Each structure stands twice: as structure tokens, then as C-alpha cells.
């Protein structure tokens, strides 16, 4: 599945054939078909496992926070760090999630989109608990999507051997949240 994710990331899902995946795996197309009946089946299993992994991370962070009696902000910060650690090792799977879900059949796409919604809902809850004075029903979607906007596309530009590590980037994201959400929003004065 990791090899297939790499093929999808390099060539795009539509441009990748079963021959390409088999060649990248160093096996025959017939052997690949022994395990998967189609390229769609590979994509679905890849995305199904990856989205399940993201939900497991959320559960692990919640359990660790409970055991360690972390406050809500520390719990959110732990989640951001955990997601970015996962993104560092799952760049091609994450790219497939963001770019290739649309190519699944309706039922399979629905499963993956529901999982994505579950992840977004969980992050929204983490944000609301961490910054109850700033995140509410009015702005929760915008703030949640801002956070995802900061972290979801790291696979396109953040390199483990680059000048900024994933851990250091997590510190930057957390600092931006802290500076941006820990103080009351200034209201515009009437003109």
C-alpha cells in the first residue's frame, strides 16, 4: 500500500496503472491482482487504513491526556504534534487522501469522507475545549479549517531534512494558536 501511495503521489491516481504499481513493488501484475481486484480496491484500503490511523491517534492523545492529567490546551498541542509526526511518515498516504478520494465509488468515498468528517469534528472539539473564550459555534469551522490549512499540506513543502523539522513546525503552529487564540479578539471600534 505504501508503494501504491508513492505511485499515486508521483504520477496521480488516474495516471497510475496496475502495471506501474506492480513494477514499483517488484512483482507481476498477476500477483498484484491476486491480492487486489482493482486499483480502486488498493486506493480504498490505503485510505481506509490511513483515516482509521488518524482516528486512532485522536483516541491515543485523549487517553494519554487523561492519564497524564493534561489541560485542554496541552491536549490540543499533543494532538497537533501527533498529527505532524504521522504526516512526516505518511506524506504519500496523506497526499492520496487529499487528492484521490474523489476517484472512489460512491459507497467507498462515503466511508472515507465520513472518517474525514470525524477527524474534523474531533479537532473542532479539541479547539473549543482549549480556547472556550474564542472558539464557538460562530467561528469554529473557520478556526478548525485554519488549523488544518496550516498542517495538511506540509507534504508539499516541509522536508524532514530541511531547515525546519516537523517537530519545530509543530512548535510554530502551536505558538500561532497560542498567540492568536489565547487573548480576546479585539472588536472593531464604530466609525
Describe these PLM feature segments.
Residues 85, 89, 120-129, 148-150, ...:
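C-terminal peripheral helix-coil segments that are non-catalytic and often amphipathic
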Residues 45, 59-89, 143-147:
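Hydrophobic alpha-helical connector segments
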Residues 46, 50-53, 186:
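Alpha-helical bundle regulatory/interaction domains
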Residues 10-14, 90, 133:
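Short coil/turn segments at alpha/beta junctions that flank glycine-rich nucleotide-binding fingerprints
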Residues 52-59, 106-132, 141-145, 171:
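Amphipathic alpha-helical packing segments from all-alpha helical-bundle domains
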Residues 18, 40, 44, 69, ...:
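Short, structured helix-loop boundary elements
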Residues 3-41, 45:
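Helix-turn-helix
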Residues 84-124, 135, 156-158:
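Short secondary-structure transition hinges
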